[in-house]
Amino acid sequence: MKKKVDTEKQITSWASDLASKNETKVQEKLILSSYIQDIENHVYFPKAMISLEKKLRDQNNICALSKEVNQFYFKVVEVNQRKSWMVGLIV
C-alpha cells in the first residue's frame, strides 16, 4: 500500500512541477492540471493514471510533446505497464 501512495505522490509531484514551468505548452498544462484535479478530487489513482496516459498519447498524436513532458509520458507508461491494476480497468 505504501508503494502505491509513494508512486501517486511522485507522479503527482512531477505533473505539478511540469504544469508550473513556463516551457510547458498550454495544452500540456491543461492535461497535467486535469490529472492533478482528478487526484485532488479523489479519483481512483489507477483510473487517473490511465486517463493521463491516454490524454498525453492523444496530444502527442496531434503535435509533439515538449521534451520534458514526453519524458514524463514515458514514466507514466512505465508505471502503468508495471501495475497489475490496469487489467480490466476501463476509462
UniProtKB/Swiss-Prot annotation:
Which UniProt key words apply to this protein? Bacteriocin immunity, Plasmid
Q: Per its UniProt entry, which superkingdom is the organism in?
A: Bacteria
Annotated GO biological processes are: bacteriocin immunity
CDD domains, alphabetized = LciA-like (cd21059)
> What is known about what this protein does?
Imparts immunity to lactococcin-B to naturally sensitive host strains.
Q: What is this protein called?
A: Lactococcin-B immunity protein
Q: Which organism is it from?
A: Lactococcus lactis subsp. cremoris
